[in-house]
Amino acid sequence: EHIFSECPDITAVIQFAAYKAVGESVSKPIEYYYNNLNCTLVILDVMRHHNCHNFVFSSSATVYGDPASVPITEDFPTGATTNPYGTTKVFTERILQDVCKADPSLNVALLRYFNPIGAHKSGLIGEDPNGIPNNLMPYIAKVAVGKLEKVHVFGNDYPTPDGTGVRDYIHVVDLARGHVCAIKKLETNC
């Protein structure tokens, strides 16, 4: 509410606000459901009161669960999630679908992506976690700058040539550009 009051010309919102550690979501499901769903509901309510009609939701490929085949396409079924974090993304997407049906003036883009990595050269966009990182790239970065001696690779029984896991990554700068493009598309009342 405060941000909309201070900046009354806001025409779009990008929803990044969420807890995002998959492992932690398994041990703290109530916190994940409360935070991740409530953030979206509050934002949508404030947007409605300020006549803001463009919403980009930072979803996740976790909505697809553990698909039987790859590559995953946008029309794959969602909902068979394997953790509470993924389920919060599915529930939020469903909430947005319902709100759009009730309010045709609301334009929503759901962006489902895999593992954001990297940083902007300014250092303003990217991950430099406090404590133990939740994903691989912060470990690689720590090795690169000499804060860590080596990266440990866990798992050797995956169905890959060397037995290690395969991941899909997207650079944070590309991700930021994609979100800006989504806003521009929504603002044309697509």
Functional labels for PLM-detected ranges:
Residues C39, I43-M47, L96, G178, ...:
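Hydrophobic positions on the long internal alpha-helix
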Residues D66-A68, T82-A119, P138-L148:
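Active-site Tyr-X1-5-Lys
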Residues K20-E24, V46-N54, V99, K185-L186:
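A short helix-coil junction within the Rossmann-fold of NAD(P)-dependent oxidoreductases
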Residues Y33, T82-V90, G126-P138, D168-Y169:
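Short-chain dehydrogenase/reductase
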Residues Q15, Y34, L41-P84, A102-A109:
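Conserved Rossmann-fold NAD(P)-dependent oxidoreductase catalytic core, especially the SDR/UDP-sugar
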Residues N38-V42, N54, F91-T92, H171-D174:
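Conserved cofactor-binding/catalytic machinery of classical short-chain dehydrogenase/reductase
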Residues P116-A119, P138-T160, R167-C190:
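Alpha-helical substrate-binding/gating segment
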Residues E1-N35:
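NAD(P)H-binding glycine-rich loop region in Rossmannoid oxidoreductase-like domains
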